[in-house]
Amino acid sequence: MLDAKYFREELDQTAKKLATRGFDLDVAKLQKLEEQRKEVQVRTEQLQAERNSRSKAIGKAKASGEDIQPLLDAVSDLGEQLDNAKEELKVIQQELNDIIMGVPNLPADEVPEGADEDENQEVLTWGKPKSFDFEVKDHVDLGEALAKGMDFETAAKLTGARFVVMRGGIARMHRALTQFMLDLHTDEHGYLETYVPYMVNQDSLYGTGQLPKFGKDLFHIEGESQDQIPMSLIPTAEVPLTNLYRDEIADEEELPLKFTAHTPCFRSEAGSHGRDTRGLIRQHQFDKVELVWLVKPEQSMDALEQLTGHAETVLQKLELPYRKVLLCTGDMGFGAAKTYDLEVWLPAQEAYREISSCSNMQDFQARRMQARFRRKGAKKPELMHTLNGSGLAVGRALVAVLENYQQEDGSIVVPEVLRPYMGGVEVLKA
């Protein structure tokens, strides 16, 4: 969440910046609540001071033999007024907090203004889309033809729409992609591989910003035990990885911290009805290799370039054409200050499709989580900056490999970097 100073000292300017994201901040309501908060805060402090003064007077009156009952009655009355004022202040602060928790991050100064994805800026393209001298098939037709290596019909019987069963060479390639990504990020990019829970509590989801605003996008767990804490399946490993330092204070020397994890991700895809209903592009369950950085504030913009570069390296080693896009203000995610999307070329769609989103959240998540660090010699800790990105979405990487490496007979050439993970197999055939 944003620093309270933006709502107390820079409200109009903050509202203008948020408007570039398509977010309408209710300035009048915030101003009214802030005025009420100040008035009740002053009244609370005055009542506390008066009560303390009367309490001291009781001791003096008692020592001099005076009747202290009137003073006792006055202190009791002041105590009741003070309790009421504190409760009123608590209600106002909670209402302010509820509003602030629903406000997105402010865009960084270099982020282009725009309403939607049509106004994103292409930064670069890498590789040249391959020309095929035969009719290109999409990943669904290719996967189903390879000994039913990709089976959506059976998955629908087992669970429902937007799930898949993979078999044989397709399943092995999916696993190979995961292993290749993890090895690359740990061996060459310096990430610490981390195994995390696939279920998280509400504090974790508040910390990274999924709650309270995006609860409908999650799958929530219903347990039989009455004392079970509310939990949800993770929508991304960003949630548990970033929350590793919730309510923690790191030493300056520990930063930057770089974590990677391979997990399944679970999303309800609320609001995406009718979009990408065919194939692996938009599933309720999908695998992803996540990259998370925790850094000092002055490091975060450079860290974003590095993190994005690490995701790009995966695509380059797979020799998959892609483009890098700087998102405009209106297309960024809730907690992001700056985001790059990597979009891989899919021949069957004749289009670039998102395969990674890399974001600098600055101190937006850290403030919610109270994830802090202490500089050497400093007394007070500071908020970290957090970053995250896909390195990559495994299912979409599989889609890209199948479509870009297809041959006329429906077989798939295995990218060279994946062959060591597939027992030396060079071609997937039916």
From Swiss-Prot:
Domain of life: Bacteria
GO molecular function: ATP binding; serine-tRNA ligase activity
Residues annotated to bind ATP: 267-269, 354-357
Record's signal peptide: none
Pfam families documented for this protein: Seryl_tRNA_N (PF02403), tRNA-synt_2b (PF00587)
Binding site for L-serine: 236-238, 290, 390
Keyword Aminoacyl-tRNA synthetase belongs to the record: yes
Reactions accelerated catalytically: tRNA(Ser) + L-serine + ATP = L-seryl-tRNA(Ser) + AMP + diphosphate + H(+); tRNA(Sec) + L-serine + ATP = L-seryl-tRNA(Sec) + AMP + diphosphate + H(+)
Locations listed in the record: Cytoplasm
Pathway: Aminoacyl-tRNA biosynthesis; selenocysteinyl-tRNA(Sec) biosynthesis; L-seryl-tRNA(Sec) from L-serine and tRNA(Sec): step 1/1
Keyword Aminoacyl-tRNA synthetase set for record: yes
Swiss-Prot/TrEMBL keywords: Aminoacyl-tRNA synthetase, ATP-binding, Cytoplasm, Ligase, Nucleotide-binding, Protein biosynthesis
Comment field on protein domains: Consists of two distinct domains, a catalytic core and a N-terminal extension that is involved in tRNA binding.
Similarity field: Belongs to the class-II aminoacyl-tRNA synthetase family. Type-1 seryl-tRNA synthetase subfamily.
Name of the protein: Serine--tRNA ligase
Origin species: Idiomarina loihiensis (strain ATCC BAA-735 / DSM 15497 / L2-TR)
Gene: serS
